[in-house]
Regions:
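Polybasic, lysine-rich low-complexity intrinsically disordered segments
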Residues: 7, 13, 19, 26-27, ...
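N-terminal interaction modules that seed assembly of large macromolecular complexes
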Residues: 53, 58-124
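Charged, amphipathic alpha-helical oligomerization/scaffolding segments
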Residues: 67-74, 93-100, 104, 130, ...
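Long amphipathic alpha-helical segments
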Residues: 110-179
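Acidic, proline/glycine-rich low-complexity IDRs
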Residues: 159, 174-234
Length: 234
């Protein structure tokens, strides 16, 4: 079976360019990814002549993989500029972007790692904290929410208080490490990055994303209804 391949470095470069050019308008977020993946069979063969018969490395250039890389890069770019938006814009955008990230993660191929070495991590404790604090200040009193889908619930009869900012920083950490590994352009490293990201999605950040999405939905629509009721009372 012939798989579509794309030059990952060019994809990431194009994604960064699109991100810089895109304006995140109020109540609007467009993620233009489709044009990135249509290449001819001749282009595919010429770009990756050494990988044509290598099934293990083929997953790096699968369409589903490239689409996930693109959305992941979009997510990281937006998170890194989260302080430039007001709370409503931030919540509205994530309510569109997070479901797309979850959907594309589900499409990642299931494979095994090639190397036994630990993959490099790029997100530092300082950068993690800067992002978490930025989001926490942006969401203010709406940052905390009650959650029952956490491991600690087995020891408690009441919901656990969680933080949207911490959840998003956790998701960002996994996704940013993944995107950074892809930017290295080393097939074996990219292959193992896919495997690790897929495993972490199933075990950690996938559930965190769903929980956070519920909390963001509550902020977006419950807050709006409460404000409308207050206007009526006045």
């Amino acid at each position: 079976m012939r798989h579509e391949r794309q030059n990952i470095s060019n994809v990431l470069k194009l994604t960064r360019t699109q991100t810089q050019m895109r304006r995140y308008k109020k109540n609007e977020y467009h993620c233009h990814i489709a044009p990135l993946f249509f290449v001819t069979s001749r282009q595919i063969k010429n770009q990756n002549p050494d990988n044509v018969n290598n099934e293990r490395e083929d997953i790096v250039f699968l369409r589903d993989t490239v689409e996930f890389v693109t959305v992941a890069a979009e997510f990281c770019a937006y998170m890194e500029h989260s302080g430039e938006h007001n709370r409503k814009e931030f919540v509205d955008t994530l309510l569109k972007l997070l479901p797309l990230l979850y959907l594309k993660a589900q499409m990642l191929p299931n494979e095994e790692s090639i190397s036994d070495d630990n993959l490099e991590e790029f997100v530092t404790e300082d950068s993690y904290e800067v992002l978490r604090i930025t989001i926490s200040e942006l969401l203010a009193e709406k940052d905390s929410y009650l959650d029952v889908f956490v491991a600690d619930m087995k020891y408690s009869d009441t919901p656990i208080t969680k933080s949207i900012s911490e959840d998003l920083a956790d998701i960002y950490q996994d996704i940013k490490n993944f995107v950074s590994l892809f930017q290295l352009g080393i097939n074996e490293t990219m292959h193992d990055a896919i495997v690790e990201c897929n495993e972490h999605f199933k075990q950690y950040w996938g559930q965190t994303l769903v929980n956070t999405l519920r909390a963001l939905h509550d902020i977006r629509y419950k807050t709006t209804l409460e404000e409308e009721e207050e206007d009526i009372d006045e």
